[in-house]
Amino acid sequence: MFSFNMFDHPIPRVFQNRFSTQYRCFSVSMLAGPNDRSDVEKGGKIIMPPSALDQLSRLNITYPMLFKLTNKNSDRMTHCGVLEFVADEGICYLPHWMMQNLLLEEGGLVQVESVNLQVATYSKFQPQSPDFLDITNPKAVLENALRNFACLTTGDVIAINYNEKIYELRVMETKPDKAVSIIECDMNVDFDAPLGYKEPERPVQHEESIEGEADHSGYAGEVGFRAFSGSGNRLDGKKKGVEPSPSPIKPGDIKRGIPNYEFKLGKITFIRNSRPMVKKVEEDEAGGRFVAFSGEGQSLRKKGRKP
């Protein structure tokens, strides 16, 4: 049995309601047309020829249409969705990042097969540059960018556009399978540390020995001049007794306090230094204490006393 290919493009083959064919792939920048199709580069969908739509419509294909792309020369594969069926026959257009994952060059052959994927529940990404940390809300940015994608494959490096800058993210993990659909799904997203990111080094704090003396080398020395430390002058020339100011505390006189070993994190305790009042009992002295109205009285007119 001999088979002849009478057309310039391969004929799609159908096995058990499955679409499978080969196309020559090109990047979206080579798509002919007056309109700018840079929006295709921002997502994970491809552009296929109209004949593919004719074949898919005859099959019992579940929606959304998802495809597995395989480069047999490099044994690399990925998954994608379809955006439009306007490409030339025998040609499909892929985003540039997808061609890099498949190690495809312009005009290379790629195997396209229809597949059914499970809905994603979890995915983990690793930014390929520390610049991704400059984004204020990375989860919101990623959620907005993934609206242009149909599925995710573990190991792929996807590209998202934010603030006129391209950020690359590697898909580290997907659940419940290595290839999942992200259309109308509730998916938990997690991030790994960016590639080449180094945590800032924290200064090492050396523990001071409790028994050793404290280092007071950082204390400021005694100042020679102090404002308002002299004696004042009065207008009448008299001198007023001024109590001498207390001598400043020397660093050597400072003693360490006892730490509170019962301290609990998040509990604030207000400690009041209440001093008990000392009751002073004064002893009564017979000759030295003054008692009011204790003397003898005197009268202006002397009266005789009756016997």
Swiss-Prot record:
Keywords: Acetylation, Cytoplasm, Nucleus, Phosphoprotein, Ubl conjugation pathway. It is found in: Nucleus; Cytoplasm, Cytosol. Pathway: Protein degradation; proteasomal ubiquitin-dependent pathway. Transmembrane segments: none annotated. Disulfide bonds: none annotated. GO terms for biological process: cellular response to misfolded protein; ERAD pathway; negative regulation of RIG-I signaling pathway; negative regulation of type I interferon production; proteasome-mediated ubiquitin-dependent protein catabolic process; retrograde protein transport, ER to cytosol; ubiquitin-dependent protein catabolic process. The modification Phosphoserine is found at S129, S231, S245, S247, S299. Residues 230-255, 282-307 are annotated as: Disordered. Interacts with USP13. Heterodimer with NPLOC4, this heterodimer binds VCP and inhibits Golgi membrane fusion. Interacts with ZFAND2B; probably through VCP. This is Ubiquitin recognition factor in ER-associated degradation protein 1. The lineage of its organism: Eukaryota, Metazoa, Chordata, Craniata, Vertebrata.
